Amino acid sequence: MERYESLFAQLKERKEGAFVPFVTLGDPGIEQSLKIIDTLIEAGADTLELGIPFSDPLADGPTIQNATLRAFAAGVTPAQCFEMLALIRQKHPTIPIGLLMYANLVFNKGIDEFYAQCEKVGVDSVLVADVPVEESAPFRQAALRHNVAPIFICPPNADDDLLRQIASYGRGYTYLLSRAGVTGAENRAALPLNHLVAKLKEYNAAPPLQGFGISAPDQVKAAIDAGAAGAISGSAIVKIIEQHINEPKKMLAALKAFVQPMKAATRS
């Protein structure tokens, strides 16, 4: 959890925002997935958001659903994902690692056991996409017991009550949603979210990272100009993996070429 705090402090000092890529663990196979993650970090990723393949990903659009299917086709299991996480942490000791997942995967292990395993492999945060704030107590309590930050989604239409709850229960960062709907680069991020950012700050929430529909450097810049601490890009990155599925070297080069200008856009 402390990795987020020290990262945001360092970025603030350097007058930068965070650029955060999302990929599904094990897409398109374990070996290439580890190379993809190394490439994202080398190209300038400040933190990682990683998905564990799940059979019914409700919040995800077709691009990320396909990533999940590719990981399943490669035979990737949650146990292997945790082995990958341990390897990533060993190689990259300081980068914050977040998981973005669904409640069933947490229940399968038992809630406490799941967060204990996260702590063991060096995961810093977990966002459970299908658990609303008001039902989050058993998840967030287990998370905090194991020094894992519980992450909450702040939708664009959040009312005052919800903003207060998110500020009170969330740690690490706040996932600020650009718009309603499912993930996807086709649907560009909507209006600047200045009013939400201001409210979250007022209630002392964890720093907001804007996600959903972030696929170009100008959107990263706009998110940071609106007061977000950074931006998360998922579908645009997963699309690059899809486009170069049969050319692993080209894939890594294309990912690097995408991430570098996205990171550059975080510098004021």
UniProtKB/Swiss-Prot annotation:
Family, similarity comment: Belongs to the TrpA family.
Keywords: Amino-acid biosynthesis, Aromatic amino acid biosynthesis, Lyase, Tryptophan biosynthesis
Catalysis performed (reactions): (1S,2R)-1-C-(indol-3-yl)glycerol 3-phosphate + L-serine = D-glyceraldehyde 3-phosphate + L-tryptophan + H2O
Organism: Escherichia coli O157:H7
Family matches, as Pfam families: Trp_syntA
Highest taxon of source: Bacteria
Assembly and binders: Tetramer of two alpha and two beta chains.
Top enzyme class: lyase
UniProt cross-references to PROSITE patterns, sorted A to Z: TRP_SYNTHASE_ALPHA
Record-annotated disulphide pairs: none
Function of the molecule: The alpha subunit is responsible for the aldol cleavage of indoleglycerol phosphate to indole and glyceraldehyde 3-phosphate.
One of the record's GO cellular component terms: cytosol
Keyword Phosphoprotein: no
Pathway(s) served: Amino-acid biosynthesis; L-tryptophan biosynthesis; L-tryptophan from chorismate: step 5/5
UniProt xrefs under HAMAP family: Trp_synth_alpha
UniProt-recorded Gene Ontology molecular function terms: tryptophan synthase activity
Active site annotation, chain numbering: E49, D60
Protein name: Tryptophan synthase alpha chain
EC number: 4.2.1.20
